[in-house]
Amino acid sequence: MTDSPVLALTKDLISRQSVTPEDAGCQDVMIARLEALGFTIERMVFEDTTNFWARRGTQAPLFAFAGHTDVVPAGKLEHWHTPPFEPTEKEGYLYGRGAADMKGSLAAMIVATERFIAEHPDHQGSIGFLITSDEEGPFINGTVRVVETLMARDENIDMCIVGEPSSTEVVGDVVKNGRRGSITGDLTVIGTQGHVAYPHLADNPVHKSLLAIHALATTEWDKGNEYFPPTSFQIPNVQAGTGASNVIPGEFHVQFNLRFSTELCNERIVERVTQTLDQHDLNYDLKWTYNGDPFLTDTGALLDAVVDAVDSVNQTKPALLTTGGTSDGRFIARMGGQVVELGPVNATIHKVNECVKIDDLEKLTDMYQKTLENLLA
């Protein structure tokens, strides 16, 4: 039996070993399909990252699909039931690295757009595609660079669906209408190394830091709001000492991360952390990594169109959530437009035996097409 268009394209993309930041020809496949629809293509290669911006139309509003062709490494091959880059159908599922994150979404976007344009060749507004090979990596030369390029020429996306795997049980049961911000601090508290038998000749930075670290860990940063939970402070890494049991360390390294809501901003977090550390009279060095601001699409035409599209396919409305990690939506939101995430079930993403339900690919395509119809028909 011949594969459906979305299944065939998903298989083609999975078969290309596009481990971040490699694209492995995935974007060439997508570009060929979009050029046939009359899209203008702009390839943007920054350092080791392949990106493209495609647009059909010149009028407002500008609606865009966004996604990534790169995938995480497959891991230990012996743990896979089937080769990760040989797409395999089994009991109604399609297995392969990237099936859910997010080559299935990319295929659904392309096929939905083909169907929409076939029915509405003179559609309203404009359709765009913002695609990168650097979402799973350091996110330095990917979507953020494309966004900066577009903003510099005042070409701003009004509405965007990011194809991240947002769903939990069935496709479309969750739409992410926002994400928390993320900021990481790398703290080094400086003491004086010495022998544990002579503590008066040393200055233990671990002991000096504990009260400050406890204060940060127990701080109520905010109460959250109707869209976001309270800000979370977590310590993923600590390091001190030489490994010897008789040496007081000279330095204590603590890495912490805050996932924060729209109730906070980077500047306020830095200010409060610095105040806490200074109150405990520490000699320290603190470096910050800004991973992204929170964003929220609480109302608007895009959200209405997506909710209606999901409801038309599933006969039930999706939950609107802001949970989970960061995504490239945080960069696109800088343009000031509406951004949501809608994609496959995320139960197997980044795992061995990653898979997507084949029927879900068809449903996701229908949801994307219906969204286009709601906005631009």
UniProtKB/Swiss-Prot annotation:
Cofactor binding: number and manner: Binds 2 Zn(2+) or Co(2+) ions per subunit.
Annotated GO biological process: diaminopimelate biosynthetic process; L-arginine biosynthetic process; lysine biosynthetic process via diaminopimelate
Residues reported to bind Zn(2+) 2: 101, 136, 350
Family annotation (InterPro entries): ArgE/DapE_CS, Bact_exopeptidase_dim_dom, DapE_proteobac, Peptidase_M20, Peptidase_M20_dimer, Peptidase_M20A
Paired cysteines (S-S): none
Key words of the record: Amino-acid biosynthesis, Cobalt, Diaminopimelate biosynthesis, Hydrolase, Lysine biosynthesis, Metal-binding, Zinc
Chain residues that bind Zn(2+) 1: 68, 101, 164
Cofactor(s) it depends on: Zn(2+); Co(2+)
Assigned EC number: 3.5.1.18
Pfam (any one): M20_dimer
Annotated metabolic or biological route of this protein: Amino-acid biosynthesis; L-lysine biosynthesis via DAP pathway; LL-2,6-diaminopimelate from (S)-tetrahydrodipicolinate (succinylase route): step 3/3
Superkingdom of the source species: Bacteria
Enzyme category, top tier: hydrolase
Reaction(s) the record says it catalyses: N-succinyl-(2S,6S)-2,6-diaminopimelate + H2O = (2S,6S)-2,6-diaminopimelate + succinate
Keyword Metal-binding: yes
Coiled coil: none
Active-site residues, as the UniProt record annotates them: 70, 135
Complex and partners: Homodimer.
NCBIfam families attached to this UniProt entry: dapE_proteo, PRK13009.1
Function: Catalyzes the hydrolysis of N-succinyl-L,L-diaminopimelic acid (SDAP), forming succinate and LL-2,6-diaminopimelate (DAP), an intermediate involved in the bacterial biosynthesis of lysine and meso-diaminopimelic acid, an essential component of bacterial cell walls.
Sequence similarity: Belongs to the peptidase M20A family. DapE subfamily.
Annotated protein name in UniProt: Succinyl-diaminopimelate desuccinylase
Species, as recorded: Vibrio vulnificus (strain YJ016)
Taxonomic lineage: Bacteria, Pseudomonadati, Pseudomonadota, Gammaproteobacteria, Vibrionales
Gene that encodes the chain: dapE
